[in-house]
Amino acid sequence: MAALRPGSRALRRLLCRSFSGGGGVRLARERPTDHRDAASSRVSRFCPPRQSCHDWIGPPDKCSNLRPVHFHIPENESPLEQRLRELRQETQEWNQQFWAKQNLSFNKEKEEFIYSRLQAKGAGLRTESGQRATLDAEEMADFYKDFLSKNFQKHMRYNRDWYKRNFAITFFMGKVVLERMWSKLRQKKTSS
């Protein structure tokens, strides 16, 4: 690939820094929260250290199973960078809400399906050994097929909106990269 040639390292570094928000992304362990961060985080109670200068990826959310990202806000953030960060945050919150609702609905309907099938068989919710009764894979396949069929339109709307949001984010990322490159070129011209 042409982008991986040794001569293009500077461009790769610049692009990587631009797309990651200035320096990188850190994976994080779950930490106790402060009151200051609990109010600002609607997605997770996880909070990165105050002095952090990177985006942090938190532990998976219990409802949505998605890992929330806590975006670093640089001191000299331009209006375009701020708009990009806000768009990414809005998209993350939208995504978290959709999957939390979807997973709740899925689990509720799955339990109802299992209960109704066990009742139809005349079996109880527990086996003779006291373990929770389950259905085999073929029986569960009926549920999965029905669930996907019932939610087909919802998933199509989600995918369409997801692609629109990602296109907008990618567009803003490109604008931010260009803005940063122009500002670096202007700095070089004024310093020479």
Curated annotation (Swiss-Prot):
GO cellular component, one term: matrix side of mitochondrial inner membrane
Protein name per its UniProtKB record: Cytochrome c oxidase assembly factor 8
Function of the molecule: Required for cytochrome c complex (COX) IV assembly and function Protects COX assembly from oxidation-induced degradation, COX being the terminal component of the mitochondrial respiratory chain.
Membrane topology annotation: Peripheral membrane protein
Predominant location category: mitochondrion
Tissue/organ expression: Expressed in atherosclerotic smooth muscle cells (at protein level). Expressed in aorta, brain, heart, kidney, liver, lung and spleen. Isoform 1 is strongly expressed in Kidney. Isoform 2 is strongly expressed in brain.
Expression induction or repression: In conditions of increased oxidative stress, the protein is stabilized, increasing its mature intramitochondrial form and thereby protecting COX from oxidatively induced degradation.
Phylogenetic lineage: Eukaryota, Metazoa, Chordata, Craniata, Vertebrata
Entry coiled-coil feature ranges: none
Post-translational modification comment from the UniProt entry: N-terminal mitochondrial targeting sequence is cleaved from the mature protein once in the mitochondrion.
Keywords, alphabetical: Apoptosis, Membrane, Mitochondrion, Mitochondrion inner membrane, Transit peptide, Ubl conjugation
Family: Belongs to the COA8 family.
Residue range of the transit peptide in the UniProt record, numbered on this chain: 1-26
Source species, domain of life: Eukaryota
Disruption of the gene: reported phenotype: Mutant mice generated by CRISPR-Cas9-mediated gene editing are born at the expected Mendelian rate. They show impaired motor skills, with decreased motor coordination and endurance. Mutant show global COX deficiency with reduced enzymatic activity, low steady-state levels of structural subunits and defective assembly in all the tested tissues.
A Gene Ontology BP annotation from the UniProt entry: protein stabilization
